[in-house]
Amino acid sequence: MSTNLIVANIKSYETLEEGKSWIEKFLAHKDSFSNLTQKEIIICPPFTLLLSFSSAFLGINIKIGAQNVSPFGEGAYTGEINAKQIKDFAEYVLIGHSERRKNFAETDDMLKKKTEISMNNGLKPIFLVQSKNAIIPQGVEVVAYEPVFAIGSGNPDTPENADEVAGVLKSENEYQVLYGGSVTPENVRNFTSKANINGVLVGGASLDPEEFYKIIENA
């Protein structure tokens, strides 16, 4: 049986105090974490909470990811957070989310740079695509298919279509392919039971640690 990756993208939510509350509620399930076999849990908080989350889950089989990374290395790049800095707190990084492609005009060339600099610094990219025809940089191992219409809409793609897209992506390379877009505790198994889907990327539902834990249990 293959491992399902269950990824939480908390996006630009949660203050320091709210993040502490999230952690406390999620850790209430700590005793049952060992029962989550064949599931790898990755939580991607905002930059301001990377230290809190990485410290809270130290020694527990929960991985931490960042939501973004600078396309530059160390240097005079005011406001940027580079891969070397992120590596102190996280193992994974999200690259290519449609919100960043749209709101920050991130191009395929920029995403390639982000991917390369992440891998060169020991981070594992989770590369997000919106279609089966997306350009995926060399070296990527985990791809998340997130159709734009499904993000935060409550209107997910059909499991059958998501599985078909995942199959096309896998035909190009041996990726682990995740599905993202309006994932809930009620529908998650419809996706993870498909042959070509290796997990889910959870957005809105991950803001509630109880909902996210239910998704993990049901996946």
Predicted stretch roles:
Residues 1-219:
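Active-site loop-to-helix "anion-binding N-cap" substructures in soluble metabolic enzymes
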